[in-house]
Amino acid sequence: MTEVLVLLDKFNFRISCCESITVGLFAQEITSIAGASKYFSGGFITYTNESKINIVKIKKTTIEKYGVISKQCAIEMALNTQKILKTNIAISFTGNAGPNALENKPVGLVF
């Protein structure tokens, strides 16, 4: 994670996140490093479909058509977070933590 902060510093960038499957782990990890507030603007934990729609403004049609465990949803999560928090970079995490398949998709992550 320190390498990420070095790169953010080099380009004078700020980062944000939108987390579902990781439930705040990325934000916790990046903010555990001293000085992270210079680079990290904040993030959203959107564990439910409702929070994705209401907080990060994911289109309901995206969820209905592709599901929350999809590249399309992950991209929309990142782009909307970037716009809301006005950062250079936003990262999103969605996926299926298991133990069973969700949306007919295996356990795993989509970034």
Locate predicted features.
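Short alpha-helical segments enriched in small residues
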Residues: 1-111
